[in-house]
Amino acid sequence: MASPVPGRKITTPFKTKGRMWKFGYHTGVDYKCPIGTDICAAYDGKVLEVGSVSWGPSYGTAIVVDHGNGFRAIYAHLSKVLVKKGQRIKTGQHIGEAGNTGNSSGPHLHFEVRVAPFRYAPQCFVDPIVLIAMKAS
């Protein structure tokens, strides 16, 4: 996987502890970026959902992508979606723009990766930075 916002600072890493999250920790990574920042596909895949998605309203305007090999990702809190449901996307493709929608404390991208069965459950969350680091090495 590649970073969905290359060069942007991570403000809330995976598993940061906090009572505001259901499991007591953050289930993805947050990248600080102004509204309108280009969001890119972290890997090739197929767009499963756009807009208000089934993963929950707290994600705001979002894109859910099946990246294959048992991985799905959500790109959340977007101001703009540039892809459609069912569309095939490529690594690095501009798919949306950062925003401040849903349960958000300011403009950023929330990037979360899950493995099958893709539920909102502790055993389904994966640290995206580990996957990005694997690609880089």
Label each PLM-derived region with a short phrase.
Residues 1-61, 91, 100, 104:
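Surface-exposed, glycine-biased beta-strand/turn segments
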Residues 1-2, 32, 81-93, 112-137:
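Acidic, glycine-rich catalytic/binding loops that coordinate metals and/or anionic ligands
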Residues 43-44, 71-80:
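Short, solvent-exposed beta-edge and connector elements
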Residues 14, 51, 79-82, 117:
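A generic structural motif
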Residues 20, 64-74:
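Short, basic/aromatic beta-hairpin or loop at an interaction surface
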Residues 29-32, 61-68, 110-112:
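Short, acidic/hydrophobic/Gly-rich beta-strand patch recurrent on exposed beta strands
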Residues 74-78, 106-114:
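Histidine-centered catalytic micro-motifs
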Residues 37, 69-72, 122:
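Short acidic/polar mixed-charge low-complexity motifs
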